[in-house]
Amino acid sequence: MTIHRLKTWPSHFQAVKDGRKPFELRYGGDRDFAVSDYLVLDEWDPNTGEYNEDEDPLVRLVTYMIDSERYGVSTDYVVMGIRDVTDATYSQVLDRAPERSERPGPRAGHDTEKGGG
């Protein structure tokens, strides 16, 4: 089980938070995503290059994965089914999560799946 901390564009962040988006589409070439991993999603604005400090991170459990061209997904990308976690799990995961990345993310309108999810 790995904890992945990910920048998430505002529209995607809100859709996950509201429960309208129970999946994540991400570039997987630089990460080894797997079922039972946790995603810590931080709302990050690509236009300002800043995190939204008014929003707490979202923690989601990866429950399912599609990562094969057989299903129409490029070999560099992965689609993950995700679900919310309990309050106790949320705290435990955040305590062990890596720090936020201060690296610049992708530019707005460019390579959205790599940075926005």
Residue ranges and their predicted role:
Residues 1-29:
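Compositionally biased, charged N-terminal/linker segments
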Residues 19, 53-55, 73-75:
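Short glycine/proline-enriched turns and hinge-like loops at secondary-structure junctions
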Residues 29, 44-49:
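Short, charged beta-turn/beta-strand-edge "cap" motif at the junction between a beta-strand
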Residues 64-117:
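Glycine- and charge-enriched low-complexity intrinsically disordered segments
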